[in-house]
Amino acid sequence: MAKKSKVVKHERQKALVEQYAELRRTLKAEGRYEELRKLPRDSTPSRLHNRCALTGRPHGYMRKFGMSRIRFRELAHQGQLPGVKKASW
């Protein structure tokens, strides 16, 4: 489990990105880069790093499921992920 402060920070960053998304899009399209530069640093989506929705773990993130590989494996073995089954060939 990640530190609670990191998880809270990530949620705050996601909210900032969402809040400034439209303004950022219009400023970029109009080429008003000086005003774009004055926006909060954390409002750019490139600063976000994907984290597991359940544990907050930043590494081993599976984008399709929104969770880390470890938590994915646990839930898949328990049969709690619909449509996921163990592969065999």
From Swiss-Prot:
GO molecular-function terms, A-Z: rRNA binding; structural constituent of ribosome
**Protein name stated in the entry:** Small ribosomal subunit protein uS14A
Which organism is the protein's source? Listeria welshimeri serovar 6b (strain ATCC 35897 / DSM 20650 / CCUG 15529 / CIP 8149 / NCTC 11857 / SLCC 5334 / V8)
The disulfide bonds in this chain are none
PROSITE patterns recorded:
RIBOSOMAL_S14 (PS00527)
Gene3D superfamilies recorded: 30s Ribosomal Protein S14, Chain N
Pfam families associated with the record: Ribosomal_S14
Which Gene Ontology cellular-component terms appear in the entry? cytoplasm; small ribosomal subunit
* Keyword tags: Ribonucleoprotein, Ribosomal protein, RNA-binding, rRNA-binding
Role according to the record: Binds 16S rRNA, required for the assembly of 30S particles and may also be responsible for determining the conformation of the 16S rRNA at the A site.
Sorted alphabetically, the Gene Ontology BP terms of this entry are:
translation
Q: Which InterPro entries match?
A: Ribosomal_uS14, Ribosomal_uS14_bac/plastid, Ribosomal_uS14_CS, Ribosomal_uS14_sf
Q: Which HAMAP family match?
A: Ribosomal_uS14_1 (MF_00537)
